[in-house]
């Protein structure tokens, strides 16, 4: 069974389990997208219009604690599926201010967790701690990993985003992220880069239709894992369904 079918069947089976649970504690989602961009960089070789099927499940009891999992196909040397696990706590300070913090694990269960970079076998899997605060449509957050993707050492991700409804079923959003590495392993002579995204989402026909423009300031093969196409600006279209 190919990787798209495997992920799809798994999501459908888990979706059946979700339907049998209490609606206020367990939920799910599935997305079909033209690309999988993570912090501005495509996780699918060649970048651009490379289809991704993604989905996840969240357990959120009334206490504010939560657990979840999320998966997507990827396409690079050393992995074709990403499976993530996360957990944390979120709550409100008042009617307009809320916060969230937790732990996120990024796993690549296939192909021995190895990424072949210049004939070196490097561990793909890593984890992050994260925290954010939200108020009046603005979110400010930071993620930190002591040993980031492919053993690149200390890494921090600082970001700001804003979203608002401009009509009953239309939401627009903007995001800016600053990626800071401890080592200059994959980014040429630099140890940081920026990514940004603007998007518009419309709810209709039981799904959410989203069009986003995603970009980074990485503009050469040397700065972007040997393939600048992975980091070039692109439009990403997706269809999402809540389960």
What is the predicted function of each stretch?
Residues 1-25:
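Cleavable N-terminal export/targeting peptides
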Residues 22-75:
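Short glycine/proline- and aromatic-enriched beta-strand/turn motifs that initiate or cap beta-hairpins
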Residues 24, 47-53, 79-83, 123-129, ...:
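Residues that define the transmembrane beta-barrel architecture of outer-membrane proteins
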Residues 26, 63-69, 95-101, 137-142, ...:
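Repeated loop/turn-to-beta-strand initiation elements of outer-membrane beta-barrel proteins
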Residues 30-34, 69-73, 101-105, 133, ...:
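Transmembrane beta-barrel strands of outer-membrane/channel proteins
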Residues 59-61, 89-91, 105, 133-135, ...:
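Residue-level signature of outer-membrane beta-barrel architecture
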Residues 117-188, 213:
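Detector for outer-membrane/organellar transmembrane beta-barrel domains
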Residues 136, 198-208, 213, 229-243:
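Outer-membrane beta-barrel "beta-signal"
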């Amino acid at each position: 069974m190919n990787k798209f079918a495997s992920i799809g069947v798994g999501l459908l089976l888990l979706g059946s389990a979700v339907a049998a649970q209490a609606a206020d504690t367990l939920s799910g989602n599935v997305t079909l997208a033209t690309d999988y961009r993570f912090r501005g960089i495509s996780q699918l070789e060649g970048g651009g219009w490379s289809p991704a099927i993604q989905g996840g499940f969240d357990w959120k009891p009334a206490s504010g604690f939560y657990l979840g999992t999320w998966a997507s196909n990827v396409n690079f040397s050393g992995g074709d599926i990403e499976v993530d696990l996360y957990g944390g706590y979120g709550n409100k300070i008042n009617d307009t201010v809320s916060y969230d913090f937790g732990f996120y694990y990024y796993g690549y269960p296939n192909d021995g967790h190895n990424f072949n970079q210049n004939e070196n076998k490097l561990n793909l899997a890593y984890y992050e701690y994260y925290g954010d605060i939200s108020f009046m449509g603005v979110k400010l957050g930071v993620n930190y990993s002591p040993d980031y993707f492919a053993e690149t050492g200390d890494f921090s991700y600082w970001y700001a985003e804003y979203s608002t409804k401009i009509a009953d079923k239309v939401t627009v959003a903007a995001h800016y992220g600053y990626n800071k590495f401890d080592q200059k392993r994959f980014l040429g002579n630099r140890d940081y880069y920026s990514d940004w995204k603007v998007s518009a989402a419309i709810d209709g026909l039981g799904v959410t239709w989203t069009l986003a423009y995603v970009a980074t300031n990485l503009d050469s093969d040397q700065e972007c894992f040997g393939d600048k196409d992975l980091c070039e600006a692109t439009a990403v279209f997706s269809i999402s369904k809540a389960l």
